[in-house]
Each structure stands twice: as structure tokens, then as C-alpha cells.
Design a protein with these regions (language model features):
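Short, glycine-rich, amphipathic interfacial segments at transmembrane boundaries or analogous
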Residues: 218-219, 286-327, 388-406
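Membrane-cytosol interface motif
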Residues: 81-85, 137-153, 284-307
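A hydrophobic, helix-centered structural microdomain
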Residues: 247-311, 348, 417, 423-453
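C-terminal terminal-structure detector
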Residues: 376-453
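A short, structured surface patch at a secondary-structure boundary
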Residues: 321-384, 423-427, 431
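N-terminal hydrophobic signal-anchor/signal peptide
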Residues: 1-20, 125-267, 438-453
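Signature of alpha-helical transmembrane segments in polytopic membrane proteins
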Residues: 1-132, 453
Length: 453
């Protein structure tokens, strides 16, 4: 099957999904909300409202990876379809509110969401099975560097669940016998040095073999290079993180507006949480901890206290080991599970210590330990620390530090307000994913312990 036909079939399947999920919204609009707007629409206006939902669902479906049939389980697809539909419904509810003279009844919208989840579930089940029946797993080879091994890629990250891994080899072994790739459809290159990688890449391109590259730090930095021409030669200009002033202005404006609105809306949660923490052990409500932000500047990050007052009485900084950490109070377990402990950082954002999106701030002593193992770790301090970030959305709490660093540097290499919004919306999804709050081994001072990166 040609690549064109493959992509065409996938687009048709995704389009069918968007149509199916739009049907419950259209019914809800025509049967209820359309009759209650300030000035009832004629047919074209009704079509426009339905089309707006259709477009929103496609946009948020891409943000939440709701269409990735080949890379996810059916349950994951349904979960992400739910969020794409829910966010689209919420935006449309605001639009309908603006079109009406009063706050519209939300129950028809909830009923539409239930219908959308049913439609999405039917689609996900059938599309997932149809995809793997039409496009069975391809013969795949994993070529790796000794330092980073292929075990993580295949086992920890689940490559073998979606690809038919028929061959593994080091870069040296592959280069000595490139014919081993004959008959292979897909190649994964994991942590390979540029010289070896280029030899393998050239062979794969010449033989129409699809290649996925797990980048090294240098690759990530180069990905943000500015393309230009000098002296009649193509050039790539690479430098320190230095985004356009317009980007920084809009980013700071969004930080102020969003954090201020969020503090007002979430004030009841702040009050209830403060009372619960105080009533548990009569200790302080907030916990202030020194963290690092842009250019290694130190600041005091605020959190609701989730651990005992004497959690670090020995003076040693430790990362949490998750649910098994006996330093966490009963209230702390609840607010950590709901991410409520992070909410006071909205004050840090309003003050300008942090941004909504950026690399998560580390404690100085833990950052120093990371830098001993990975000197490149300091590169993430080019940008202001954030409440959420690329690594938080696309990784897990216990994703290896090297991979988290690569994700953070990928974000830094491509500053974009659009990307910031994508990360903000994607953060909503991970709030309800338990695995994103998993801890590390008990007693570890950093996630580097025992890690061969």
C-alpha cells in the first residue's frame, strides 16, 4: 500500500470520528439551544454553529492525541476523545451563553457529552481493530547506542506493543552489516552519535525505510536552528534561548490574566484546603521552598503543605516516592492526587517568578546533583520555570531525567504561544492520570539514582 493511500484512509477514519461526535452536539443545538438564543438563526447560522464545534473537536483531538489509533490502547483513545469533546462542548457552551440573554441550562449539554462518549467509544473500538487489520504491525529494527540501550525503548516505553520488533543491534553492528535492514519497514534509532546515525539514515532513505530518531541533547538544540543563507551557502544559526520580544510580552500578559482569573475562581478551594491542612496537625498551611528559575535565579515557590512539618529534618533534599512516602499527611495524599498542592504557585506566576508553561523548577541541591551526571541540565535554565511544561504533559513523574531534559530543551528550542496553549490544554488531561504522579524509589535524593542514561 502506498503512503498516499495509507494517509488517505487514516484521514477518512478520523473524519468519520469527528462527524460521529458532532452528531450529538448538533441534535442538542437544534432541539434545545437554537430555540433559546437571543435572535434565532436561519439555516446558515445553525450550520455555522455546528461547523464551529466540528472544527474545535478536530483541533482538540489533535491536542489530546485522540486520533492516534496506532499508538494507544482503546481505553486511552476513549479517554482522550472524552477530553477533546468536553473542552469543545465547554467552549460552545460559552458561545451559546454569549448568544443568549441568560445562562443556558447545562443539562442538555451534559446529555450531548454522554452521547459523544458513546459515539467515540463505538468509533474507537471499531477503528482500532480496523486499523491493525488493515495495517498490521510492521517489521521493525531498533538500533541503539550502548550507553542508552534499547531495553527502555522496547520495554519501558512499550514499543513492542505496537511494532513488530524483529531485530536489535548496536550502531556499530548495523554499520558493519547494513543489509540487515533489508526487509525492514521501520527503524528506530536510539541515542546514536551523529556520524553513525547519518550513515544509517542515508541507507534507510535510499531504501524507503521509515526512520524514527530518539534525539540526543545536541539534536534537540539543533532542531531549533534558524535556517539562513550566508556567503552563498546554507547556514543553521544556533544560539542561546532568545525569543522575540512580542512572544515574551504576550506570554507574560497571559500569565498575569490567567493566574489572576484562576486565583479568583479557585479561592473557595484555597479556603477549604487551608482549613483541612490546619485542622490535621495545626502546622503551617503553606510550604515555601527555594527553587531555580531562569538564569539560575532562586525564588521561593509556594505550595500547600502536603508533608509532615519535620519531613526533611535531616536537611537532605529528597524527591517524593509517591503513595509509599510516609512523610505525606492524609490530607496531603488527597491534595497531591488532585494536584491542589500546586495551586499556590499561581501567586508565583502573578509575581513573575514563574510562567504558566516552562520547565518545572528544581531545588538547587537536586539540580546540582543532576548537573554532576548531566552537565547539559543547566541548559533548561535558559527559560523561566513553569507550573506545567512539555515534560510534564508528554512524560511521567518517573520518566528518566535525560528524557525529561530532552523534552524541556525541545520546548525551549521552539518558543511558541500556540505550543503554550497546547500544553495548557493537554495539562487538563494529565490531571486525571494516576501514572503521571507516580514517584521514585523510596529514599532517593534524585531520580538519577540507579539510572543509566
Amino acid at each position: 500500500m502506498t503512503r498516499f493511500r495509507h494517509d488517505l484512509i487514516l484521514r477518512m477514519i478520523k473524519l468519520l470520528d469527528a462527524v460521529l461526535v458532532t452528531i450529538p452536539f448538533a441534535m442538542c443545538w437544534y432541539l434545545y439551544y437554537a430555540k433559546r438564543v437571543a435572535s434565532p438563526y436561519y439555516a446558515k447560522g445553525d450550520y455555522l454553529v455546528v461547523a464551529l464545534f466540528f472544527v474545535l473537536f478536530i483541533i482538540f483531538g489533535r491536542v489530546y492525541d485522540a486520533f492516534l489509533m496506532s499508538m494507544q490502547r482503546i481505553s486511552e483513545i476513549i479517554y482522550e476523545q472524552f477530553f477533546a469533546a468536553a473542552v469543545s462542548d465547554f467552549i460552545m457552551y460559552i458561545v451559546i451563553w454569549l448568544l443568549s440573554k441568560h445562562l443556558p441550562n447545562i443539562l442538555p449539554g451534559v446529555a450531548a457529552l454522554v452521547g459523544q462518549v458513546i459515539m467515540a467509544s463505538i468509533w474507537a473500538y471499531n477503528a482500532h481493530h480496523a486499523y491493525f487489520k488493515t495495517f498490521p504491525p510492521q517489521a521493525t529494527a531498533v538500533i541503539y547506542d550502548i550507553r542508552r540501550g534499547m531495553e527502555q525503548l522496547i520495554g519501558k516505553y512499550g514499543l513492542d506493543a505496537k511494532y513488530k520488533v524483529v531485530s536489535t543491534a548496536t550502531a556499530g553492528e548495523c554499520i558493519e552489516n547494513l543489509s540487515m535492514l533489508d526487509g525492514i519497514n521501520t527503524v528506530f534509532l536510539s541515542g546514536i552519535h551523529s556520524h553513525d546515525r547519518n550513515i544509517i539514515l542515508k541507507y534507510c532513505v535510499e531504501n524507503n525505510i521509515t526512520v524514527f530518531v530518539v534525539p540526543r541533547i545536541g539534536d534537540t538544540i539543533m532542531s531549533g536552528a534558524h535556517h539562513m543563507h550566508m556567503f552563498h551557502l546554507p547556514m543553521l544559526r544556533v544560539g542561546r534561548y532568545n525569543p522575540q520580544p512580542e512572544y515574551l510580552f504576550v506570554k507574560r500578559l497571559l500569565d498575569i490574566v490567567i493566574s489572576a482569573i484562576a486565583l479568583v475562581i479557585l479561592s473557595p478551594i484555597f479556603l477549604v484546603t487551608a482549613i483541612a491542612i490546619k485542622a490535621t496537625d495545626h502546622g503551617p498551611v503553606f510550604y515555601k521552598q527555594i527553587r531555580l528559575t531562569k538564569d539560575s535565579k532562586e525564588f521561593g515557590t509556594l505550595k500547600f503543605r502536603s508533608m509532615r512539618v519535620d519531613a526533611e529534618k535531616d536537611g537532605v533534599a529528597r524527591l517524593s516516592s509517591g503513595e509509599n512516602d510516609d512523610r505525606i499527611t492524609p490530607v496531603g495524599k488527597i491534595i497531591r492526587a488532585c494536584r491542589v498542592d500546586e495551586l499556590p504557585q499561581l501567586i508565583n506566576i502573578l509575581k513573575g517568578d514563574m510562567s504558566i508553561v516552562g520547565p518545572r523548577p528544581e531545588r538547587p541541591e537536586i539540580a546540582a546533583q543532576y548537573c554532576e551526571e548531566m552537565p547539559e541540565f543547566s541548559l533548561r535554565l535558559q527559560a523561566k520555570a513553569g507550573l506545567t511544561g512539555y515534560a510534564q504533559v508528554y512524560g511521567k513523574y518517573n520518566t528518566t531525567p535525560y528524557d525529561k531534559l530532552t523534552m524541556d530543551l525541545m520546548y525551549i528550542a521552539h518558543p511558541s504561544i500556540v505550543e503554550d496553549f497546547k500544553i495548557m490544554f493537554a495539562t487538563v488531561k494529565i490531571l486525571f492520570m494516576p501514572e503521571s504522579t507516580e514517584g521514585i524509589s523510596e529514599g532517593q535524593t534524585t531520580a538519577m539514582s540507579g539510572e543509566n542514561h
